[in-house]
Amino acid sequence: MLKEAISEIQRGCAEIIDEPRVEKLLKAYFEKGETYTVKAGFDPTAPDLHLGHTVLLQKLAIFQKYGARVQFLIGDFTAQIGDPSGKSATRKILSTEDILENAKSYKEQVFKILDASKTDVVFNSEWLNALGASGMITLTTTFNVARMLERDDFDKRYKSGTSIAISEFLYPLLQGYDSVHLKSDIEVGGTDQKFNLLMGRHLQRSYDVGKEQAVLMVPILEGLDGVQKMSKSLGNYIGVSENPNEIFGKVLSISDELMWRYYELLSTKTLAEIERLKSGVEAGTLHPKKVKEELAIEITARFHSSESAQNAKDEFDRVHSNNQIPTEMDEFSSSEAISITKALVDCNLTPSTSQARRDIKQGAVRINQEKIDDETLSLESGEYILQVGKRKFAKLKVN
C-alpha cells in the first residue's frame, strides 16, 4: 500500500524536494495512523477556478486519501500584493471587496475535488495582520536583496530597468511565513512557485519550527491553445463552475496532442490505461475523437454528474454532428433595432465589435443557421438565433 501511495503521489510531479520526508510521513500513517499536514496557497485574484488549478487540487485529494489534513490557504493578505512570479511588471492591487468575494467563490468550488472533512480553510490575513511592523522587520532580516535578485523574473526586470516594488520582495517572505505559522509538513505548488515554496523551508529553519516542509511541484497546465498556460485573462481556460455543455465542448476542442497531456494531469485513469488508449490510437484501432470524448465525459462528470456529462455529449452530437441548434441557450432582448456587431457583443458571443466584424468576415457568424457576410446588417423586430463558431449560441428578441 505504501508503494502504491508513493507512486500515485509521484505521478505527474515535475519535482519533489525532500522525497524521503514524504515517504517517512506516509510510512508513519500506514504503520501508526499518524496524520500530517499538506499546505497549498491560492491568492483569490479572480473569482473562478479552472482546470489548471485542479492539477494541484487533485494532488491534494490524493494526499487526503493517504492520511493528510489539507491546509487550503486563501491568501487574502498576499493577494493585496499579487504574486510576482513570472511577471514582467508590478501587478495591479485588488480591492478588499474583490478579494473577499473571490475568496467566497473559491470556498464554494474547491470541495468539488477536496474532502471537506479533511480540509482546513484558512486565511493568511489572520496571522499576517497580527505580525505588525516589528514582526515584519524581523521577517525581512531572514533574507537579503542579493538572494532575492537571484529569482529569474526579478533578475530580468532589474537588468532591464523595469520597476520592482518593495512589496514584491515581501511576497515570497510572506508566503514562506505562512508555512512557519501553519507548521506545514508538505507544501504543493506549481513549478513557477519554486522560489516561494523553498522560502517556506528556509523560514521554518530560521524560525526554528523543528521541521522543514517537503515540496512537491506540479506542472503548469497549458490552455486550450496548447501553447500558453491556462488563464482566464487569456481566454484559453475551462472553468470549474462552467456548465456541462461548455466544459464538454471545450475539452473536445483541444488538439489530439494536447489531449494526452490532459489525460496525464487531469484524468484518474492509471498510466497503464492511458498508454493502452495511446497505443490504440497509434495502431488505428481507436479513433482520437472517441478517446477525447471519454476524457471530456470524465472531466465534465467530475464537476457535475455522470448524467450531466452524458447529456452534454448528446447535445454536442445533436448540434455539431447533426447541425441542429441547442435545446437550451442564453436569451437576450433589445427594445429597438440593433446592429449585428452590437448584438453579438451584447449577447456575450464576442468581446468587442471589432472582433465581431472579424468573425463575420471569416464566415463564423450565422443568424437562424444562415451564414452572413454583411457587418452593417441591422436586426429589426423579430426573434433570432445568433451563432458564432461551432459552440456559441444565443437567442435574441428585438421588440
Curated annotation (Swiss-Prot):
<comment type="subunit">
    <text>Homodimer.</text>
</comment>
<feature type="short sequence motif" description="'KMSKS' region">
    <location>
        <begin position="229"/>
        <end position="233"/>
    </location>
</feature>
<comment type="similarity">
    <text>Belongs to the class-I aminoacyl-tRNA synthetase family. TyrS type 2 subfamily.</text>
</comment>
<feature type="short sequence motif" description="'HIGH' region">
    <location>
        <begin position="44"/>
        <end position="53"/>
    </location>
</feature>
<dbReference type="InterPro" id="IPR001412">
    <property type="entry name" value="aa-tRNA-synth_I_CS"/>
</dbReference>
<feature type="binding site">
    <location>
        <position position="232"/>
    </location>
    <ligand>
        <name>ATP</name>
    </ligand>
</feature>
<dbReference type="InterPro" id="IPR024108">
    <property type="entry name" value="Tyr-tRNA-ligase_bac_2"/>
</dbReference>
<keyword id="KW-0067">ATP-binding</keyword>
<keyword id="KW-0694">RNA-binding</keyword>
<dbReference type="GO" id="GO:0004831">
    <property type="term" value="F:tyrosine-tRNA ligase activity"/>
</dbReference>
<dbReference type="InterPro" id="IPR014729">
    <property type="entry name" value="Rossmann-like_a/b/a_fold"/>
</dbReference>
<dbReference type="GO" id="GO:0005524">
    <property type="term" value="F:ATP binding"/>
</dbReference>
<dbReference type="GO" id="GO:0003723">
    <property type="term" value="F:RNA binding"/>
</dbReference>
<keyword id="KW-0648">Protein biosynthesis</keyword>
<feature type="domain" description="S4 RNA-binding">
    <location>
        <begin position="338"/>
        <end position="398"/>
    </location>
</feature>
<dbReference type="GO" id="GO:0005829">
    <property type="term" value="C:cytosol"/>
</dbReference>
<dbReference type="InterPro" id="IPR024088">
    <property type="entry name" value="Tyr-tRNA-ligase_bac-type"/>
</dbReference>
<dbReference type="InterPro" id="IPR036986">
    <property type="entry name" value="S4_RNA-bd_sf"/>
</dbReference>
<protein>
    <recommendedName>
        <fullName>Tyrosine--tRNA ligase</fullName>
        <ecNumber>6.1.1.1</ecNumber>
    </recommendedName>
</protein>
<dbReference type="InterPro" id="IPR054608">
    <property type="entry name" value="SYY-like_C"/>
</dbReference>
<dbReference type="Pfam" id="PF00579">
    <property type="entry name" value="tRNA-synt_1b"/>
</dbReference>
<dbReference type="Pfam" id="PF22421">
    <property type="entry name" value="SYY_C-terminal"/>
</dbReference>
<dbReference type="InterPro" id="IPR002305">
    <property type="entry name" value="aa-tRNA-synth_Ic"/>
</dbReference>
<keyword id="KW-0436">Ligase</keyword>
<dbReference type="GO" id="GO:0006437">
    <property type="term" value="P:tyrosyl-tRNA aminoacylation"/>
</dbReference>
<comment type="function">
    <text>Catalyzes the attachment of tyrosine to tRNA(Tyr) in a two-step reaction: tyrosine is first activated by ATP to form Tyr-AMP and then transferred to the acceptor end of tRNA(Tyr).</text>
</comment>
<keyword id="KW-0030">Aminoacyl-tRNA synthetase</keyword>
<keyword id="KW-0547">Nucleotide-binding</keyword>
<dbReference type="InterPro" id="IPR002307">
    <property type="entry name" value="Tyr-tRNA-ligase"/>
</dbReference>
<keyword id="KW-0963">Cytoplasm</keyword>
